Amino acid sequence: MVQRLDVARRREPHTQRRHDERAATGPAPAGPVRHDALLAPAPRTPGPHHVLAVAVYLAAAVAMWSHVWFGGDPAHTITCNCGDTSQQVWWLEWFPWALSHGHDPLLTNAMWARLGGVNAITNTSWMAPAALLWPVTALFGPVASFNVANLLAPVVSGWAAFVLAGRFSRRVAPRLVAGGLYAFSPFMLRNTVLGHIDLTVTAYLPVVVLLGLGLLTRGARPVRTGLVLGGLSVLQFFTGVEVMAITAVTVALGALLVVARRPRLVRAALGPLLVAGSVAAAVAGACLAYPVWFFLHGPRHVQGPVWPVVSSAPWRIVDAGANVYSTHTSLRAVGYLGPQGPSTDFLGFGLLAAVVLSAPLWRRRTSCALVAGVGLLAWVLEFFPARAWASLPVLSSVELVRFALPVSLCVGLLLAASIDAWWEAVGRRWRTVSDAARRGAARGAVVALSAGAFVPLLVTYSLPFTVTTARVPAWFAHDAPRLARGTAVLTIPFAYALESQPMAWQAETGDAFDLVGGWAFVPGANGVDDELMSPPGGAVAALRALSGDPRRVTPAVQRAVRAAVAAWRPLTVVLIPGDARPGALAATTATLGVPPRWSDGAWVWTFGPTSRLGPVHPL
């Protein structure tokens, strides 16, 4: 018998045996020590548990979007046909259209037509999601794809976090909590209502962490892991570069902490790590060499930050903000008409208190200590000095507040470990049959307190989301598809930045025309920085002046607009009365020198290749 036990012990995995020896000789930790992500391979998750997680997150997503799926028409109901939302709808339509019509998918002149076009990779073009949703777009239109993407993005992201949480808890409920916090955090909800698919399809971060842990515990095949990592990196690049950059920073922070805390573990796994990294680099390099060059140096690329870099504040993680329930905020202009909700980086005092008070139970677990360190460093990055961040290449385009994404993941994982540890502690304290009642009461208290920790966060949510019907003006629905190919459309108001409704109209009519202007990251006046950082002059500035304050148009503005219209022929100028500002019709007519015609609810000026403008009439 002794001989058999000795043989069995020799067959145990080295990492698990070493861990058991430490547990036997050292002070006993309070939590479930055997299940440590850095000390042993994760247990296999049963298939029904995956199905349960997907079902729970899908039910939550459907509840959030119930006004779309139960009270509206998914092909025509949307948060707003304006702002960022119209931009997202445009890209979902354009990428399949470009591929099916033989156009370059990396550079488009369908937007910012006559002005140089748009570098698709520089923008949030989501080529991978647009390709996956191509059948939906072809059958039901881009608004339907927008709604499907918003429905499924948190499900996929939450499920990935649920799988990762299996490294921190063996129980389903704590893992569901971790995935749920990641999938439905304020960061995710704020970006979901604006349709930022590049920021809500975030499965890449937990999956990369999972792959790294598999290599550290020597439970994964390095070549296969490298192939998976390389393939996922390619998909993520064509989904959202910003999440890819955030993941790289987060993993780098974690790697530094692992090296500092467990150098022997890293040395033991160095071979598999190098093999997997080399394979991943080869796969990603082969697929992304040209797209990365196009992103950094291709036509119409931009350098430096695309937004003014702004640091967050440390206390915002427990401060939901002043306009949580207000609908009259800047969020309306960006693309959401409902209540603003909590700050992007808010989590609430309850969740943080639950994690901190549970620290004595999980602090001896290496994986939990490392996750706490990564979460703390990511939180510090949210209020990193803005001027220093703006000087970093590539990373300067990442908004600092968006490091709330890894923070929410780390808090979710620690919360799962905390719930699991309390459950185990209660079981050890009242383990006999006679203690069943007390054990049940104590575990009921664990459940109640865990749920209560979410209250400060959940009370800031206003659900279901507010939606409206996507309105396409009659002229764009009926007349625009009959325009001759190559004709550009100039709208009044000028389609610029958040005045981007024409982008949605263009997408919802099958990209029947090229649009002058649009909402995209393009080079500004200096030809290097984004147009928001270096506002363009010339025709763009003149059209903005004509649209913004028609009653104060100067002769210089009129000359610039006329020169642009003459150079951009064939061109159709369209003014929708309900969207234009007072005096826009008179100012546009006086500037172009010819009267418009009324067609399908719009004033229209048509200039063919040889058409001439009439005499200008000063205002």
Question: Which role fits each region the language model picked out?
Answer:
Residues A442-A525:
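Extracytoplasmic
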Residues M1-F70, P272-A281, G440-A448:
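Start-transfer (signal-anchor) and selected internal transmembrane alpha helices
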Residues T77-N81, N191-T200, S311, R332-S343, ...:
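Membrane-helix boundary/interfacial segments in multi-pass membrane proteins
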Residues T25, S278-A282, I419-L458:
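Signature aromatic-anchored transmembrane alpha helix within multi-pass, membrane-resident enzymes
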Residues Y57-A60, A149-F168, A173-A260, A276-V292, ...:
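Membrane-embedded helix bundles of polyisoprenyl
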Residues A60-S157, G180, S185-R190, H196-A203, ...:
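Membrane-interface coil-to-helix junctions
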Residues A220, R262-V275, V355-A388, R428-R439:
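Membrane-interface helix-loop-helix junctions at transmembrane boundaries of multi-pass membrane enzymes
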Residues T79-L99, L273-A276, A280-P360, L400-V401, ...:
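Periplasmic/ER-lumenal interhelical loops and adjacent helix-loop junctions
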